[in-house]
């Protein structure tokens, strides 16, 4: 496997990756990205910028229409995934949590849902049951294990979808807007779970537009613009300090008003302090 600059194992290496839906609608534009083992990465961008498409390429569900995408030093191509041994290897090592948990939930009970993935990969039944017990205990799902996923609240569904991913014990977690639709308490719970997973060496890549969580979920961030390109990379602190960048990619908004004869422009960074630019008198 390719070694990163610090000697760590390189998980992902994307070079000039592009993607077109239907051969005409551009979703990704010349994306360059690298991820080493054990990193916490955020992919930031406004709705519709291509974050979900990028995660699905990283998850081996979509394939680039130009450029090269590699994972574990192997090309992520449709042909490569026809190899049953590589497909099984990849599916065991990479788990994807969709933004909408209903996409992942289709089994009669929560326990069936958690067991589905490991059983599909051919793991022994006793091992699958042990994994189910561990995951339900970790995510506090014991009381709802026999219920239908479709009878659960949005937050409970998200927990079950995450449990179905964790049951495979993947090395890499791809999370698409994981806090979307969650109440504040469940958001805090999820961040704590992600911290615990990172502490045991998991590589975590989170696509989000929620800047208030950035410093808690990532050590490095990429920023996508509305032209579907990665336009910046840096630490959470560097990204959050660059208000011009955040305005340009539509992650914060700005408004102007007059005060004491001057024009004040405010860039609102959600839960953070906002910028005051003093312009000329009108």
Predicted features, each with a name:
Residues 59:
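Helix-to-loop junction immediately C-terminal to a conserved catalytic motif
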Residues 237, 241-282:
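ABC ATPase nucleotide-binding domains
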Residues 126-144:
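Conserved ABC ATPase "signature" region
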Residues 173-176:
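Catalytic Walker B motif of ABC-type/P-loop ATPase nucleotide-binding domains
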Residues 148-152, 156:
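Conserved ABC ATPase signature
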Residues 208-209:
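H-loop/switch region of ABC-family ATPase nucleotide-binding domains
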Residues 67-79:
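Conserved ABC transporter NBD signature motif
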């Amino acid at each position: 496997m390719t070694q990163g600059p610090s000697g760590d194992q390189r998980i992902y290496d994307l070079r000039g990756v592009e993607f077109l839906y239907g051969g005409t609608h551009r979703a990704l534009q010349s994306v360059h990205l690298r991820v080493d083992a054990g990193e916490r990465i955020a992919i930031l961008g406004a709705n519709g910028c291509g974050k979900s498409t990028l995660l699905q390429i990283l998850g081996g569900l979509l394939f680039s229409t130009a450029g090269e995408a590699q994972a574990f030093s192997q090309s992520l191509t449709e042909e490569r995934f026809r190899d049953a041994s590589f497909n099984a290897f990849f599916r065991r090592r990479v788990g994807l949590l969709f933004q909408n948990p209903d996409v992942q939930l289709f089994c009669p009970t929560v326990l069936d849902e958690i067991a589905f993935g490991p059983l599909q990969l051919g793991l022994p039944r006793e091992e699958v049951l042990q994994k189910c017990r561990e995951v339900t205990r970790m995510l506090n799902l014991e009381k709802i294990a026999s219920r239908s996923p479709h009878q659960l609240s949005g937050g409970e569904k998200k927990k079950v979808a995450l449990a179905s991913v964790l049951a495979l014990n993947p090395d890499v977690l791809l999370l698409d807007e994981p806090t979307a639709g969650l109440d504040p308490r469940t958001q805090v719970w999820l961040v704590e779970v992600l911290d615990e997973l990172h502490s045991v060496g998991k590589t975590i890549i989170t696509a989000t537009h929620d800047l208030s969580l950035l410093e808690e979920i990532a050590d490095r961030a990429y920023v996508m613009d509305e032209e579907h390109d990665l336009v910046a990379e840096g630490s959470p602190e560097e990204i959050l300090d660059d208000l011009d960048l955040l305005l340009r990619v539509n992650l914060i908004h700005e408004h102007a008003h007059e005060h004491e004869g001057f024009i004040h422009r405010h860039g609102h960074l959600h839960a953070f302090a906002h910028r005051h630019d003093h312009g000329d008198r009108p």
